A protein has these predicted regions:
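Short glycine-rich substrate-engagement loop in P-loop NTPases that contacts/grips substrate
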Residues: 65-69, 103-142, 154-161
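Walker A/P-loop nucleotide-binding motif
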Residues: 79-99
Length: 236
C-alpha cells in the first residue's frame, strides 16, 4: 500500500485467523450474557434452591406444568394484558416449582423477575432504618413479581397492611403477579374473614387466574375473562 510516497506492507488476516477472532468474540459475548444472567438470578432468586426449578428438571408428574410453559411462551401478551396466576394446592403439589420454572425461564430470556415471600419482605421492612416505601417501590419495578407461600406470614396489623400495599401497588401499575398458596379458593372468598384479609384476597383474585395444582379440581372454576385467556393459550 502506498501512503505519502512510501510503500507499506499491510498484513491480511487469513481465513483461520478471522474465524478464531470471531469465535473469541462470540465466547466473550456468551460469557457476558452468563454474567448478566447470574446477576439477575442473584438479585431475583434469593433462595438458591429456586435456581434449580427449571422446566428441564420437571418429572412430568403434574400436567399443570403446561400452564407454566404456555405462560412463558406468551409472556409478552401476559405482561401487556396484566395476567397473573394464583397457583393453589396442598403441600407437595408442585406449585412453587411451577412458579420457579416461570421465573428461571424469563430470567434466561433477559427479563427481570423477583421471586420471594412476604415473610422475607416483612423482615426487610422491620430491619434497622428500613425504608418501607422504597422496598415496595423496588418490588413494583419488576416486570413480574412472584410471591411464594402466601398465608405463612404473620397476621399482625402492620404485616397485613404491608402485604396489601405491595399487592395494591402492582395492581395500580397494572403489572402481573404470580402467587402460590396452600389456601383454598373457598377460604380466600369466605365472608367470615376480617376486612384486612378480605381486601388482600379480593385484590389477588382480581389480578390472578386461580389454578388448582393438586390434581383434578372438583370445585367449579369461574369463567373469568383472564381464566378464558389462559385456557385459550393452553388449547392453542
Amino acid at each position: 500500500v502506498s501512503l505519502m510516497g512510501f510503500e507499506h506492507v499491510v498484513s491480511c488476516l487469513c481465513e483461520c485467523e478471522v474465524k478464531a477472532r470471531q469465535e473469541l468474540d462470540e465466547k466473550m459475548q456468551r460469557e457476558e450474557e452468563q454474567r448478566q444472567l447470574y446477576q439477575r438470578k442473584s438479585v431475583g432468586l434469593r433462595e438458591r434452591r429456586f435456581w434449580e426449578w427449571k422446566f428441564e428438571n420437571d418429572n412430568g408428574s403434574n400436567q399443570k406444568i403446561l400452564i407454566a410453559r404456555q405462560y412463558v411462551e406468551n409472556w409478552t401478551d401476559m405482561k401487556r394484558k396484566n395476567v397473573g396466576l394464583l397457583l393453589m394446592g396442598p403441600v407437595g403439589t408442585g406449585k412453587s416449582f411451577f412458579a420457579g420454572c416461570i421465573a428461571n425461564a424469563l430470567l434466561e430470556q433477559g427479563e427481570r423477575v423477583m421471586m420471594t415471600n412476604f415473610s422475607r419482605i416483612l423482615n426487610e421492612m422491620t430491619s434497622y432504618q428500613a425504608d418501607k416505601n422504597q422496598i415496595i417501590q423496588n418490588l413494583v419495578d419488576y416486570p413480574l413479581l412472584i410471591i411464594d407461600d402466601l398465608g405463612i406470614e404473620r397476621n399482625s396489623e402492620f404485616a397485613l397492611e404491608q402485604v396489601y400495599n405491595v399487592i395494591d401497588s402492582r395492581y395500580c401499575k397494572m403489572l402481573p403477579l404470580i402467587v402460590t398458596t396452600n389456601l383454598g379458593l373457598n377460604e380466600m372468598k369466605s365472608t367470615d374473614l376480617d376486612t384486612a384479609h378480605q381486601r388482600i384476597y379480593s385484590r389477588i383474585l382480581e389480578m390472578c387466574v386461580p389454578i388448582y395444582c393438586g390434581g383434578e379440581d372438583k370445585r367449579k372454576e369461574e369463567g373469568t375473562e383472564k381464566l378464558v385467556q389462559v385456557q385459550n393459550l393452553i388449547t392453542g
